[in-house]
């Protein structure tokens, strides 16, 4: 008897934002005390961001991941002990090691010995994590995966650099992906080009207990914008081709929530109406690997995304990395 084809399917979503919501005006007032000039109008015009959330000093990335994961597990209706794969996409882990995924596994009380590891692809990290989990499930190695994007980017921001500190926020989003005979994830595409590593990076490193170089995020905004608008349409089209779908068959586009101008540019190039694009950058800022699952959960919980609809996620991040996935919700 022929063995049925395995797919991976989204069972549930969850997200969490730390309670400290910082508006542009509040951030502007804080920066003014340091002699840094900016304004709500300047930030909104260039990014579309109105507010972001910052984690308290004693809250870690794994803490944010835990709250988002609990909500995704509840929404999926699965037993945590059935989760045999945990992948956390983050660039701001609790420690150099152990991985945030292992810390999360322990905090969830999962004792089944399943695999747990981090993926570091910055803002495209969740697309990388979803494609990786999908491959593991399709191969039969794992059946139920918890994939999380979680960040505390406020820890690596230089609040004397107005071009970067106004952009980012903290948060976490999670998805339960499970083996299914029904198609779920339909196609993915991942790429990287390390020759662009210097345009978005934290150039410092720890050498024998001493930080060598700057530990703060550095970004060449114009170079990032130019690269992003060039690669995002291409990787989205590639993922759609693998899914045997045309852009007009996509019900919802969930781009990495980096900058409203980049997002609308990609949406327009794909020929999709703006109404089909999920936007949370205005209230969350850029939460790096957390942005896509945060936006996905928001659109699921408010009823926009319905079962059976096609969703396209795409993102680009430091490395440089970029990726996209298409799935039927």
UniProtKB/Swiss-Prot annotation:
Name of the top EC class for this enzyme: transferase
Record: active site: 123, 256, 286
Keyword annotations: Acyltransferase, Cytoplasm, Fatty acid biosynthesis, Fatty acid metabolism, Lipid biosynthesis, Lipid metabolism, Multifunctional enzyme, Transferase
Catalysis: reaction(s): malonyl-[ACP] + acetyl-CoA + H(+) = 3-oxobutanoyl-[ACP] + CO2 + CoA
Segments of this protein annotated with the region ACP-binding: 257-261
Protein localization: Cytoplasm
An example Gene Ontology CC term for this record: cytoplasm
HAMAP family assigned: FabH (MF_01815)
Record note on domains: The last Arg residue of the ACP-binding site is essential for the weak association between ACP/AcpP and FabH.
Known role: Catalyzes the condensation reaction of fatty acid synthesis by the addition to an acyl acceptor of two carbons from malonyl-ACP. Catalyzes the first condensation reaction which initiates fatty acid synthesis and may therefore play a role in governing the total rate of fatty acid production. Possesses both acetoacetyl-ACP synthase and acetyl transacylase activities. Its substrate specificity determines the biosynthesis of branched-chain and/or straight-chain of fatty acids.
Record protein name field: Beta-ketoacyl-[acyl-carrier-protein] synthase III
Originating gene: fabH
């Amino acid at each position: 008897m022929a063995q049925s084809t395995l797919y991976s399917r989204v069972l549930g979503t969850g997200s969490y934002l730390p309670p400290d919501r910082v508006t542009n005006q509040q951030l502007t007032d804080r920066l003014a005390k340091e002699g840094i000039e900016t304004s709500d109008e300047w930030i909104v015009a260039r990014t579309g961001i109105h507010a972001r959330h910052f984690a308290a000093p004693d809250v870690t990335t794994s803490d944010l991941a835990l709250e988002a994961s609990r909500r995704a597990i509840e929404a999926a209706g699965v037993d945590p002990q059935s989760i045999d794969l945990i992948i956390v996409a983050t660039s701001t882990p609790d420690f150099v090691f152990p991985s945030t995924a292992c810390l999360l596994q322990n905090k969830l009380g999962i004792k089944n010995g399943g695999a747990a590891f981090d993926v570091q692809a910055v803002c495209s990290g969740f697309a990388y994590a979803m494609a990786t989990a999908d491959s593991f499930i399709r191969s039969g190695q794992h059946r139920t995966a918890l994939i999380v994007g979680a960040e505390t980017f406020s820890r690596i921001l230089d609040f004397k650099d107005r071009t970067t500190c106004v952009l980012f926020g903290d948060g976490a989003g999670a998805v339960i992906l499970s083996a299914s005979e029904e198609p779920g994830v339909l196609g993915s595409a991942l790429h990287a080009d390390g020759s662009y590593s210097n345009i978005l990076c934290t150039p410092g490193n720890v050498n024998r207990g001493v930080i060598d170089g700057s530990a703060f995020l550095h970004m060449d905004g114009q170079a990032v914008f130019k690269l992003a608008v060039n690669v995002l349409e291409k990787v989205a089209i590639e993922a759609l081709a693998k899914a045997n779908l045309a852009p007009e068959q996509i019900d919802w586009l969930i781009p990495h929530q980096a900058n409203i101008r980049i997002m609308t540019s990609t949406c327009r190039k794909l020929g999709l109406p703006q109404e089909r694009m999920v936007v949370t950058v205005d209230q969350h800022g850029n939460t790096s690997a957390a942005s896509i699952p945060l936006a996905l959960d928001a659109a699921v919980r408010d009823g926009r995304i319905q079962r059976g609809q096609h969703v396209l996620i795409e993102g680009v991040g430091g490395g440089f990395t970029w990726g996209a996935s298409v799935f039927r919700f």
